[in-house]
Amino acid sequence: MESGNSTRRIPSFFLLGFSENPHLQFLIFVLFLSMYLVTVLGNLLIIMVIITQSPLHTPMYFFLANLSFVDICFTSTTVPKMLVNIQTQSKAITYADCISQMSVFLVFAELDNFLLAVMAYDRYVAICHPLYYTFIVNQHLCILMVLLSWVVSILHAFLQSSIVLQLTFCGDVKIPHFFCELNQLSQLTCLDSLSSHLIMNLVPVLLAVISFSSILYSYFKIVSSICSISSVQGKYTAFSTCVSHLSIVFLFYSTGLGVYVSSAVVQSSHSAARASVMYTVVTPMLNPFIYSLRNKDVKKALERLLEGKL
């Protein structure tokens, strides 16, 4: 005799993607495959340049190499599964795979968030306390900050996964997205729990606000320090070291904010998926170009690497 409370039916999960139109699937496949390859190759090139070129063996580029690695993993969490689903003409994803994808995505999303804050702190010390820079931002501190970012990101993902595993889904779960995203899963439960929804929605926002606030504080001190420099050339030199990082910060947080605004304002089942493309795919793809085009040290290192290969 089977008790209704003793067993729990595992629902079927489906990723609806961007469009139900079958004629658009090939175009979407080619577009995302191209962006994924550019993302992986571009970030791998940045990592290779930093590892092989000794002038780039500094804290600033140590953090950049970590950011490039995280961006590769960040995109690899979502895009390959979407490409496989398009290729096989299947929208299905298992419950275990969905939870795993959501958890891993959360880890790398928060790592991006924390690493941008760490990089802002690095620029703050370099510009505001240049005489003590090598003493303060030493190898031990660099490794410690990266490890701490990993630990907090993993703990956050574990917390969210634990909550999602307790949620009840009624019937088949059709996710209007191209990956298992936390906010989408929280909206598809059939038994609402106010405390669970508060944690699922507020904790990521709180972590983002903390990191963004630390970035704002770092740049407030940086701007104050730059304004005190008397020479125009000195101001330009100091600020030029921050331009690439500022560009990435703007892309990351503006596109992330756009996802939440779009999903809240636009009442479309696929609006959140389309908006999140900038946040999850385009930004990691553009990061290597921003650093290679705007950063003289990286451009010179790239030239030396290419000359050595030819």
From Swiss-Prot:
Domain of life: Eukaryota
SUPFAM superfamilies: Family A G protein-coupled receptor-like
Coiled coil: none
Membrane-topology annotation of the record: Multi-pass membrane protein
Any one of the GO BP annotations: G protein-coupled receptor signaling pathway
UniProt similarity note: Belongs to the G-protein coupled receptor 1 family.
Role: Odorant receptor.
Protein name per UniProt: Olfactory receptor 7A42
Organism lineage string: Eukaryota, Metazoa, Chordata, Craniata, Vertebrata
